[in-house]
């Protein structure tokens, strides 16, 4: 019998238990952990919400553990966590960062009215050109499962080197697992136009993982009226831990508060977008 894989000290599941009608599910990115969403999770918990940020399968331990997982496994982890919250609460809101945003889109579409609102951070419908090309080519490699772990050229995409160094995340990535992220990109893109969930799209202008054009692509694909976009001019990919973290947390909490209160939607000049007064979201710096 194999010993259980060790869990990174700061990378464990985060949960703040509360009663009430609503709960929030926070989903982290590929090779990362719930740690990157802690500022958001803690702030939402202070609003009296039950908040769960699960450690997705294969994460928060050793890169070798991730090698045995794929998009379908991370999706299964997200479904399990959502349904656990939905068993205890009427509505579940989803906050997803990076791969977690892709998971959130699919989950919100699948669970329909049980999902009260969706916050998408750094949504990687397409990665940077080089990485996207490498992953597409990797999918065609024979025996990709036996391919060795690939060293990351850079650490977590956050502007403060000190923050990046303190983040619990893998410094190597299994190529087959990373390549399966394309399945998530395709699944999310297919469902965006069919979503009926109020959605807030947040993105850093200097995102090196998922270029900022992803945010506008998401907004353009969404067809429901209640959608909002905020671009943070100084931030990179890991929004909740970057230099505009306070704004990211404030905007996320304000959006969820507004949707929970079912505030009216006020149309903007752009027919594809609307903003709720309480959130005051716009496609500018916060």
Feature map (PLM): residue ranges:
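Catalytic histidine neighborhood in serine/cysteine hydrolases
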Residues: 216, 220-238
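Short beta-strand/loop motif that positions the catalytic acidic residue
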Residues: 195, 201-203, 207
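The serine-hydrolase catalytic nucleophile loop
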Residues: 31-41
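Conserved alpha/beta-hydrolase "acid-adjacent" motif
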Residues: 208-214
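Gly/Ala-rich beta-loop-alpha elbow adjacent to hydrolase catalytic centers
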Residues: 96-100, 104
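Conserved alpha/beta-hydrolase
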Residues: 41, 45-65
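Catalytic active-site module of serine/aspartate enzymes centered on a nucleophile-bearing elbow/loop
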Residues: 233-286
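Active-site nucleophile loop of the alpha/beta-hydrolase fold
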Residues: 119-129
């Amino acid at each position: 019998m194999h010993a259980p894989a060790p869990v990174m000290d700061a990378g464990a599941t985060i949960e703040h238990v509360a009663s009430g009608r609503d709960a929030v599910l926070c989903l982290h990115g590929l090779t990362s952990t719930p740690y990157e969403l802690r500022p958001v999770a803690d702030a939402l918990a202070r609003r009296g919400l039950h908040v769960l940020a699960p450690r997705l399968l294969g994460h928060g331990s050793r890169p070798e553990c991730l090698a045995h997982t794929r998009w379908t496994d991370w999706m299964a982890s997200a479904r399990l966590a959502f349904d656990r919250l939905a068993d205890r609460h009427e509505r579940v809101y989803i906050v997803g960062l990076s791969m977690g945003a892709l998971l959130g889109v699919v989950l919100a579409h699948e669970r329909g009215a049980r999902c009260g609102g969706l916050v998408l951070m750094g949504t990687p419908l397409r990665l940077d050109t080089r990485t996207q090309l490498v992953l597409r080519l990797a999918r065609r490699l024979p025996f990709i499962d036996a391919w060795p772990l690939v060293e990351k050229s850079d650490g977590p995409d956050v502007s403060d080197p000190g923050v990046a160094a303190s983040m619990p995340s893998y410094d190597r990535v299994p190529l087959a697992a990373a390549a399966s992220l394309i399945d998530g990109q395709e699944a999310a893109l297919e469902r965006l136009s069919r979503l009926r969930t109020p959605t807030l799209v947040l993105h850093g202008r200097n995102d090196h993982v998922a270029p900022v054009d992803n945010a506008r692509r998401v907004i353009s694909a969404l067809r429901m009226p209640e959608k909002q976009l905020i671009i943070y001019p100084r931030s990179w990919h890991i929004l909740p831990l970057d230099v505009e973290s306070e704004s990211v947390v404030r905007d996320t909490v304000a959006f969820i508060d507004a949707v929970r209160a079912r505030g009216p939607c006020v149309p903007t000049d752009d027919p594809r977008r609307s903003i709720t007064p309480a959130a005051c979201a716009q496609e500018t710096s916060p």
